[in-house]
Amino acid sequence: MSKQNITYNQIDFVVKAPRFRIVFSYMSDKGVAFVREYLLRLLKITPCKPAQIAQYFGFNQYETEVALADLEQHKWIFWQDDGLIVLSTEGQRLFQDSQDSPHIPTLKECGGEYRMELLDSNFLKKNDCDKNRQQAIELVVEPKVLSESSEIVRKTFQNRFRQLMEDDIIKLDEKDISLYKIDAIEPKGVPDYFRFTQQFELLPETGEAKERHDVPTVTHQENIQQAITAQLERFGHHDNLRELRNSMAEISDDDTLKVLFGGTLDFNEYLKVYQKHEQQNGLYFLGQIYHQETLFQQINKILDELSKKSSKKLYWLAPSDIYWGKQRKIHGNIQNLIDKQKNGYDFRLYLPLPSERNRHEKQEWLNHFKDISDKVLYGFCEGFLDGNTEILFLEDQFAVVCYHAKLSSYPVTLPIGFMTTNIRQVNHIISLAKNYLSSPLFPNKNEDEIGQKDFGLLKP
């Protein structure tokens, strides 16, 4: 493992990005036709009568009338009382910067669908947007901004038109153009969401948190960054190192406390533990379980080698942490475990609930994982290992443990953990999880009211 800036968490944020149908007219700078150009150049030098123009160009009367009608239609000329034809103010404007050749604006119309996020009014490319806000933290947009979004879009489109051309948001073959006017703005259905992943890093030399990176896909982001900071402060957290010490003792993990002992990650100690697990054919990691590619490669290898006649339990017990599951990558890993169930195991994702009857929390989880089959979504009573420890296990094969450390040194949770295939250790970890799920919810109640901490399917 190289000693560079270390990513310890990755979180998706979303901002409402309404869709609008925008129709606009634009002007293209274009040299005028030969006759037009020389006739305009002549009139710039001196006013003329029709007969003089006919003589100068060798036109007959009809050709002269057609040429003059064209200029008159565009309001580039007018007749004086003495019969002389002169350039109008509009005609004089065609000669930009005292150039000899005139340039005229050709008006064209264009329409398209555009998306604009509502915090810094950045227009967005389609692939930076998402129809869903699941697996992310939504940043707050003021109601006033939502109600005035059409007018904000109009002003921003006008003011940043050239920049939108350069950023390839507005796609036109012609490049040297300018906006003439916006003809129509029409909101289009349910808004999209601007989705971006914010990486949270620490410095390996000191363990200190690094400042957040800018969002790479947008130019304007002052309000976005302020909204992220406000949201993180709103979530807040108390230091849970004391509770983690108890969880580590339950797991029989003597190593991780040394890594976090001072309230920050000791990278040198982390490397020692990493190498120790590597020597034991295990894996030690920093970050969310669902971000560990090597971990899931090992898991997939184990699953692919299972006997299809076996009927093992593959359980994933989520922690009680606001940042858990707030990144789209979790969806792919869960779906992968669902798809491989034909290999001979029963997969369940256990999600923490304050009580069995809490319909609001159940519905929130169902919405959060709305693209996942509800046949694998289970509820359990929050509080397993103080809610700070996540477990993923397959009976008789492996166990993954991830502690979710809330430390004052870091703005968000620092997940850290390990995978083991040591059967003795695996069985110990699995017994902790199974004993908790089967333990009575109300041990002092009558037998009919005792209940279990395993609440069963979220949607029976």
Q: At which residue positions do the language-model features occur?
A:
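Basic, amphipathic N-terminal segments
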Residues: 1-6
